[in-house]
Amino acid sequence: MRSLHILLVITASLLASLAVSAEADPSTRTANVVENNKDKSRFLRDGGTTEAQTDEERATITLGDKVVSDKAATKDLLERLLALGTPLKTVQKEFLNMPLIKTFAELSKHPNWRALDKYERMQWQKLNEGQTLTYMRVGDRSYSKEKAQEQLLRWVAQKKTVKSVYDDLQIEGFARNTDAARLNWRAYNMYDKWFTAASQMQRNPQQYAKFGTGYHSEQKTTEVFEKWAMEGTHIKSVIKTLNLNNKSASEMANNENFPALLKYVKLYLDFKPFRDLNAKSRLQARRPIS
């Protein structure tokens, strides 16, 4: 308890000094927080776009209107609090200066919401070591972050509207503190970014994708992708080939290879009947003739 008190004092002092420093010297002022999540009803657009949001993984700590703790510093603080076994409500109230009795929709507007959400996930992973953290749930099916990304990419390739995904992920329950909305909000934000990026994509057909030996034209890329799709090369492998692995949703959406990834996902889906037919033919060929 004494260790927690000392950490609280140090943190409060650090945040206050950083805030004063940023206010006193404009040259050292940190960037303002990118507009936080608004009430999810504002994102109801039937195939439309949404304003850019801060990335779901980039938790920071804010005091007033200044970011006073970057991603790395925030992670370090949260790890220290986790090691001390600090309760979630204590982190929320004492370290993140967030009200305790609020709906998810109201809390999501607070600049420290992502830091709170990150700490909650860190707590779960510590208590459930070795288990995969559920990132998205649709109906009775649960998805890890990797599998959720693949499913969301499929929906983008199929041009599934933001409104439809909003409904499937039950985000309307955010204001009622439903478990589904609380779990799925990151996946919804990820889809919103990708759908928006897909609707605005423009690529040079002569330098359509960069992989392997360098840039390839759209025609060459399509030829290679069709071969891979026919062979059943998994989407995860192509994400790695296009150097899109280990990137946030925003980084992927802004990457020059994102249009190519969506092209492959579409081809992968389109070629599934042919892969299934080939698999059936190979199975029949292996059966002994009676």
From Swiss-Prot:
<keyword id="KW-0732">Signal</keyword>
<keyword id="KW-1037">Host cytoskeleton</keyword>
<feature type="region of interest" description="Disordered">
    <location>
        <begin position="33"/>
        <end position="56"/>
    </location>
</feature>
<comment type="function">
    <text>Secreted effector that acts as an elicitor of hypersensitive response (HR) specifically on plants carrying defense protein R4, through its interaction with this protein.</text>
</comment>
<feature type="short sequence motif" description="RxLR-dEER">
    <location>
        <begin position="42"/>
        <end position="58"/>
    </location>
</feature>
<feature type="glycosylation site" description="N-linked (GlcNAc...) asparagine">
    <location>
        <position position="246"/>
    </location>
</feature>
<keyword id="KW-0964">Secreted</keyword>
<feature type="region of interest" description="Y motif">
    <location>
        <begin position="249"/>
        <end position="270"/>
    </location>
</feature>
<dbReference type="GO" id="GO:0044196">
    <property type="term" value="C:host cell nucleolus"/>
</dbReference>
<feature type="signal peptide">
    <location>
        <begin position="1"/>
        <end position="24"/>
    </location>
</feature>
<feature type="region of interest" description="W2 motif">
    <location>
        <begin position="151"/>
        <end position="174"/>
    </location>
</feature>
<feature type="region of interest" description="W3 motif">
    <location>
        <begin position="224"/>
        <end position="247"/>
    </location>
</feature>
<feature type="compositionally biased region" description="Basic and acidic residues">
    <location>
        <begin position="36"/>
        <end position="45"/>
    </location>
</feature>
<feature type="region of interest" description="W1 motif">
    <location>
        <begin position="118"/>
        <end position="141"/>
    </location>
</feature>
<dbReference type="GO" id="GO:0044163">
    <property type="term" value="C:host cytoskeleton"/>
</dbReference>
<dbReference type="GO" id="GO:0005576">
    <property type="term" value="C:extracellular region"/>
</dbReference>
<protein>
    <recommendedName>
        <fullName>RxLR effector protein Avr4</fullName>
    </recommendedName>
</protein>
<keyword id="KW-1035">Host cytoplasm</keyword>
<dbReference type="GO" id="GO:0030430">
    <property type="term" value="C:host cell cytoplasm"/>
</dbReference>
<comment type="similarity">
    <text>Belongs to the RxLR effector family.</text>
</comment>
<keyword id="KW-0325">Glycoprotein</keyword>
<keyword id="KW-1048">Host nucleus</keyword>
